[in-house]
Amino acid sequence: MDELGIPIYKRGFPEHLLHGYEFTIDSSTKIQSVGGRHDVTKLPEMNAYDIKSEGMRTALWYNPVRNDGFVLPRVLDITLRGYDGKRAVIDSSRHKSFHTDERWVQWMMKDSMDAQPLKVGLDDQTQKIAHSLHNCVVKIDSKKADTMSYHIEPIEDSLKGCLHTRTMLWNHLVRVEMSHAAQEIAYALKPTYDIVVHAERRDRSQPFRPGDQTLINFSRGQKVQMNHNSYEKMVEGLAHLVIRGKTPELIRDEITKLDEICNRWIRSRYDPGEIKAYELCKVLSTVGRKMLDQEKEPADEANLSIRFQEAIDNKFRQHDSERLKIFEHRNQRRDEDRFYILLMIAASDTFNTRVWWSNPYPCLRGTLIASETKLGDVYSMMRLWYDWSVRPTYIPYEKSREQEKYIYGRVNLFDYVAEPGTKIIHWEYKLNQQIKDITYEQGNPCDLFPDDDEAIVTKFDDVAYGQMVNDLINGGWDQERFKMHKILKSQGNVLTIDFEKDAKLTSNEGVAMPEYFDKWIIAPMFNAKLRIKHGEIAQRRNDDPMVKRTLSPIAFAPIVLQRLTLARFYDIRPAIMGQALSRQQGQSTYDEEISKIEGYAEILQRRGIVQIPKKPCPTVTAQYTLERYALFLINILEQHIIQSTDEDVMYSHPRVDYKLEVHGENIIDISQIVIFVFDFLFERRRTVRGVYESRYMVTRIRDAQGQNRINVITEFFPTFGYHLSRVKEATIIQEIMYLNFLPLFFLVSDNIIYTHKQWSVPLFLYAHELKVIPLEVGSYNDRCSLVSYIEYMVFFPSKAFRTSKLDEVQPKIAREMLKYYINTKIFEGGINLNVVTTKQLLYETYLASICGGLSDGIVWYLPITHPNKCLVAIEVSDERVPASIRASHIKLRFPLSVKHLKGIVIIQVDEEGKFTVYSEGIVSHRVCKKNLLKYMCDIVLLKFSGHVFGNDEMLTKLLNV
């Protein structure tokens, strides 16, 4: 057959009369537009794709369940490329067969980040599969439906410089957390406490006496508030305080639900059957999220929740020995308190240590918060009234903390509801040295002993460090046991200080602030300068994460933020605001703020963008971010190889070379940067490899193990592989410096989770001497990006140091580091592919709402079998984007095999049901009227000029080549 008819009919036409047609278009079933834009809020009701109506940032973590399966828009491109690459193999019987690179094909499909979770309808009359568009419904025979996918076009706004074909780049940057806003960690008096002034004294030399209720400045029952002078007296240690539980309005409904469960349990005479652990866990998780929302929770939250439910069941059993002790009769004990005490024991046992507000698991921190509303300071109450103490098996033990009360709770400034002028406590965090003038000869070693008498300096503990090195030499790199905080001295240890735990209310002295409060801490090995102090809220809470909540906010520039290694001192969120489904809405000010950074125009001009927008589209910001990141990374890493430049020339470090000449493809993926670093620095190539080649190279290196990993690295980068092979025979520092490049292969990707929540990998730190340090990665320190790595690489040794002889220990350290990196599987954590791979449609739909609106379409492919095998794409869409542009974008779906796409047909249906047809390539069209009995419809006749179409099982065959 060389001709195909596609009927287009309106309401009143009997569909069963079109039973013989494989494709039909119902132009009368539509979604009414609003304000000239498609009403995407109706998507959940349509047979289209699965996007939930919720906040956009929340939608990023939605697991699509309301669908009929996933499709890959590029599956034909991938399988055709595999088909093109098949090789002839002759077996022993001289039989010739063809084999494709099955491993590559399977990897490409698994690695695709644009899977579409489709919701389809089944037409009862015609038994066709129905796909809804805003202006029509497309129905297709099930034999042809396997190549069908949506083609969403966010309409570009010329004033914003949109390049929506780069939406995938924005999606990618959010996943590697390089398109984020930040807020520094902050604290406030716990809203679950009423802190009441019980007595006062004139100065700290006058002790508080038991029973003394002397008041000087305040009346009886005065509650301490941070904006009241009672707070100043408390901080000065002049007020003796009593803590009582209080229920914040935000979680009143949840506490009411918990009270109902508690009362049922009490009325049943403590029947364990009344304790529904799953129900309790859900309520407690809600409490935890409402009071301190992280938006992105730990990957193993589900497993921990199950353990917590089991602990609840065990603790409420009537014959549990600990429960029996809690139920011993004492005057001050109440059944309601016992309920929360048992929950807290279960939570503590689940986490194997004391639970704090900053606990990463919502159900556990929710248990603490809910218990505080009833008990006040929970752990001191458990110790004093119920004789329960933290277990010696807990890590950390923290028994000494039972004697004090803790009145400050961590708040997330993204969500904290407070008026401007409200007093809080928050961290300041900045680079100790953002830029420095140096020469290659003098290098940029880390100054571990900065000259600042007023600051607290974070220092290495030589004894602990020596022990770690000894253990490394004798037993190899212990990725779970070696920790950076263990080799730092306790004073100023920025990895262990925690204001929530260090500021405490003592029984005799009032509030005791930690010794580091309101003092600068310089942590030279992290190039960090920090201070925690009192401050004020500058702006009200806003859905825009870029709003600056304090008067001394943390940096927002994406490259600077990547340099802030100590991620525990700030929160981040995608720089996105608004709803997932909206016709029209504003975007975050993030993009506008980024456009004001020095060098913004120069970076974009490298990408061919001449007209610099004042309020850019996120796709423009994404191009800027990745281009600047590539230049920055190349600059700092090239300092670690031997250079032929003038050694005594002064230059600024680190810097971005806007004029660095690079060829090949535009960088749209961080894997391209990683591969280009090795190509450029070691192989002297200036050509950027394609995104699929780069991602596959990184995967190949990760999948290999042992000597095979070195072989694969050498296959791709012969010079770098040679340097690795020389590490075991190294005699000078420069010859082992190449080991610091290896983390690049394992620490960053948009579709990995680290195997453990807090592992460490070895890295050299260049100071007055060479140190090997545990570079900690995982959900508590790093976020599957290079945040934990970059700033260490800003340091590099002087020429004299790098050419100096290795001592007797350093070669042993280098050999163990190499051994670790050729065997590590740190990147093999579990990942929810359903969540990660299905967000491209979400980004496109959201982008439409902040730019020019949405244009939607459905595309499928017709196989041509004669005279040459090829494809014709057929698309049904609205008329909002010119057909020629839509056709060019269909070709972009075939970056690997576009030669097989020989024709394109675009049928555009407007809101009134009128349509136009566009065709190119081997296909032509004609529009006719068709009469069936007393009914009439339009029919689009497609002519394939000497080509024959067919092969219903095309995709099935390609997937089985």
Curated annotation (Swiss-Prot):
Its main location: virion. The keyword rRNA processing does not apply. Keywords: Capsid protein, Clathrin-mediated endocytosis of virus by host, Host-virus interaction, Inner capsid protein, Viral attachment to host cell, Viral penetration into host cytoplasm, Virion, Virus endocytosis by host, Virus entry into host cell. Pfam families: Orbi_VP2. InterPro entries: Capsid_VP2_Orbivir. GO terms for cellular component: viral inner capsid. GO terms for molecular function: structural molecule activity. It is found in: Virion. Belongs to the orbivirus VP2 family. The VP2 protein is one of the two proteins (with VP5) which constitute the virus particle outer capsid. It is the major target of the host immunogenic response. Responsible for viral attachment to target host cell, probably by binding to sialic acid. This attachment induces virion internalization predominantly through clathrin-dependent endocytosis. This is Outer capsid protein VP2. It comes from Bluetongue virus 1 (isolate Australia) (BTV 1). The lineage of its organism: Viruses, Riboviria, Orthornavirae, Duplornaviricota, Resentoviricetes.
